[in-house]
């Protein structure tokens, strides 16, 4: 029973990725954007290192 609960909770999509929530059908066109959104904070972290390297890590 717990295994069935996990399968429904994690809901593996066709591509094998874990989907924790699905957008309503009206917003299906935004799926590619929503997939990229969690990566944006990582870009800011990398930008901080690039910025510090450009000012010679003062």
Swiss-Prot record:
Entry membrane topology: Single-pass membrane protein
Positions of the propeptide segment: 1-21
KW Transmembrane helix (keyword) present: yes
TM stretches of this protein: 29-49
Keyword Lipid metabolism tagged: no
GO cellular component, one term: chloroplast thylakoid membrane
Intracellular or extracellular location(s): Plastid, Chloroplast thylakoid membrane
Domain of life: Eukaryota
GO biological process: photosynthesis
Keywords in alphabetical order: Chloroplast, Membrane, Photosynthesis, Photosystem II, Plastid, Reaction center, Thylakoid, Transmembrane, Transmembrane helix
Role of this protein: One of the components of the core complex of photosystem II (PSII). PSII is a light-driven water:plastoquinone oxidoreductase that uses light energy to abstract electrons from H(2)O, generating O(2) and a proton gradient subsequently used for ATP formation. It consists of a core antenna complex that captures photons, and an electron transfer chain that converts photonic excitation into a charge separation.
Protein family according to the UniProt entry: Belongs to the PsbK family.
Matches recorded under NCBIfam families: PRK02553.1
PANTHER family: PHOTOSYSTEM II REACTION CENTER PROTEIN K, PTHR35325
Subunit text: PSII is composed of 1 copy each of membrane proteins PsbA, PsbB, PsbC, PsbD, PsbE, PsbF, PsbH, PsbI, PsbJ, PsbK, PsbL, PsbM, PsbT, PsbX, PsbY, PsbZ, Psb30/Ycf12, at least 3 peripheral proteins of the oxygen-evolving complex and a large number of cofactors. It forms dimeric complexes.
Protein name, as recorded: Photosystem II reaction center protein K
């Amino acid at each position: 029973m717990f295994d069935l609960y996990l399968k429904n909770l994690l809901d593996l999509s066709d591509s094998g990725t874990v989907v924790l929530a699905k957008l309503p059908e009206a917003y299906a066109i935004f799926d590619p954007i929503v997939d990229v959104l969690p990566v944006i904070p990582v870009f800011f972290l990398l930008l901080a290192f690039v910025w510090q390297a450009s000012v010679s890590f003062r």
